[in-house]
UniProtKB/Swiss-Prot annotation:
<keyword id="KW-0963">Cytoplasm</keyword>
<feature type="binding site">
    <location>
        <position position="232"/>
    </location>
    <ligand>
        <name>S-adenosyl-L-methionine</name>
    </ligand>
</feature>
<comment type="function">
    <text>Methylates ribosomal protein L11.</text>
</comment>
<dbReference type="GO" id="GO:0032259">
    <property type="term" value="P:methylation"/>
</dbReference>
<keyword id="KW-0489">Methyltransferase</keyword>
<dbReference type="GO" id="GO:0016279">
    <property type="term" value="F:protein-lysine N-methyltransferase activity"/>
</dbReference>
<dbReference type="InterPro" id="IPR050078">
    <property type="entry name" value="Ribosomal_L11_MeTrfase_PrmA"/>
</dbReference>
<dbReference type="InterPro" id="IPR029063">
    <property type="entry name" value="SAM-dependent_MTases_sf"/>
</dbReference>
<feature type="binding site">
    <location>
        <position position="189"/>
    </location>
    <ligand>
        <name>S-adenosyl-L-methionine</name>
    </ligand>
</feature>
<dbReference type="InterPro" id="IPR004498">
    <property type="entry name" value="Ribosomal_PrmA_MeTrfase"/>
</dbReference>
<dbReference type="GO" id="GO:0005737">
    <property type="term" value="C:cytoplasm"/>
</dbReference>
<protein>
    <recommendedName>
        <fullName>Ribosomal protein L11 methyltransferase</fullName>
        <ecNumber>2.1.1.-</ecNumber>
    </recommendedName>
</protein>
<dbReference type="Pfam" id="PF06325">
    <property type="entry name" value="PrmA"/>
</dbReference>
<feature type="binding site">
    <location>
        <position position="146"/>
    </location>
    <ligand>
        <name>S-adenosyl-L-methionine</name>
    </ligand>
</feature>
<keyword id="KW-0808">Transferase</keyword>
<keyword id="KW-0949">S-adenosyl-L-methionine</keyword>
<comment type="similarity">
    <text>Belongs to the methyltransferase superfamily. PrmA family.</text>
</comment>
Length: 300
């Protein structure tokens, strides 16, 4: 079988958004390259490739893909070169591409994300595995913003908390939280395809029994407070999310934010402050920032 490979040349900041556009256009697999895995790319230059099966007539889809990539700039996102290129690839190349780019990745000392088709075994008894189907959209769990999110979860969770995962995507953060002892998890995503992908990934990970996954726009209409709210999303979505958080965060609870490129950190901090939240700690990975925040108290 032949596949059509569509590659968008971009920068790190836009990688997740472009992956979503390509998935929504009918891609069956996404491959992300940046300087950490491809020597020919330097700095924050990145490439997102999507593989479409023969049954999809890709040239028909290209104008909309191009238009949606360009529209990202309207949300304040830098897209870099933004060029879109087509290539036919044979099945064998595709199989090799998966193997090359989706390797088990140790996110933290205790959590490793593993493509579902590998037989990777933990190297020690404390290493827990997050099994993900790499054919599904919304990240394989190896993006730096996901790394930061999992690191922040590991820093604040002690077990037994209630957690809300906003923009769950592949469900990776909910699976990580379940491994860290959280049983009461609500996972939401505005996109039904993402919710379906998350549910399928929950089924691959026995630890996730009982997670509620539903389509929802941010936290509109959600009731019932949580100890931890985690959101790895673009700043353009985090800004309207933040004012919804204080009503849903228990006293002493944490809001964990990732998906923030360094240039957008100031606007996120301003929005947090205007809504009675303060930054307890910030984590950095490349150009990305993760913020551990909590409600301000009288002592602050
Ligand atoms: C960068 S992905 C994060 C996926 C996953 N949580 C992770 O950390 O790898 C962002 C997700 O947010 C979702 N999203 C975007 N806007 C949203 C909204 N208004 N409400 C809920 N989810 C949203 C997207 O569909 C996407 O799945």
């Amino acid at each position: 079988m032949e596949w059509t490979k569509v590659t968008v040349a971009t920068v790190n900041e836009a990688v997740e958004a472009i992956a979503n556009i390509l998935t929504e256009a009918g891609a069956e697999g996404i491959q992300i390259e940046d300087a950490s895995i491809n020597d020919t790319l330097v700095g924050d230059v990145a490439a997102v490739s999507a593989f479409f099966p023969e049954t999809v007539f890709v040239p028909e889809k290209l104008p909309l893909i191009r238009q949606r990539v360009l529209q990202l700039t309207e949300f304040g996102l830098s897209i870099g070169e933004g060029s879109v290129n087509l290539q036919q690839v044979a099945d064998d190349d595709w199989a090799t591409a998966w193997k090359k780019y989706y390797q088990p990745t140790r996110l933290t000392r205790f959590l490793t994300v593993v493509p579902s088709w590998t037989d990777y075994q933990p190297t020690d008894e404390r290493e827990a595995l997050i099994r993900m189907d790499p054919g599904m959209a919304f990240g394989t769990g190896t993006h730096p913003t996901t790394h930061l999110s999992v690191q922040m979860l590991e820093m604040v969770l002690r077990g037994g908390e209630q957690l809300i995962d906003v923009g769950t995507g592949s469900g990776v953060l909910s699976i990580a939280a379940a491994h860290l002892g959280v049983q009461d998890i609500r996972a939401y995503d505005v996109d039904q395809v993402a919710v379906d992908a998350a549910v399928a990934n929950f089924d691959l990970n026995p630890v996730t029994q009982g997670i509620i996954a539903k389509p929802n726009d941010l936290l509109h209409g959600i009731t019932g407070a949580a100890d931890v709210i985690v959101a790895n999303m673009l700043p353009v979505v985090l800004v309207p999310l933040i004012p919804q958080v204080p009503a849903l965060l228990k006293e002493g609870g944490h809001l964990l934010l990732a998906g923030i490129i360094t240039e957008k950190e100031a606007v996120i901090r301003e929005t947090l402050s205007a809504n009675g939240l303060m930054v307890e700690e910030s984590l950095h990975m490349g150009d990305w920032v993760g913020l551990i925040t909590r409600l301000k108290t009288d002592e602050d």
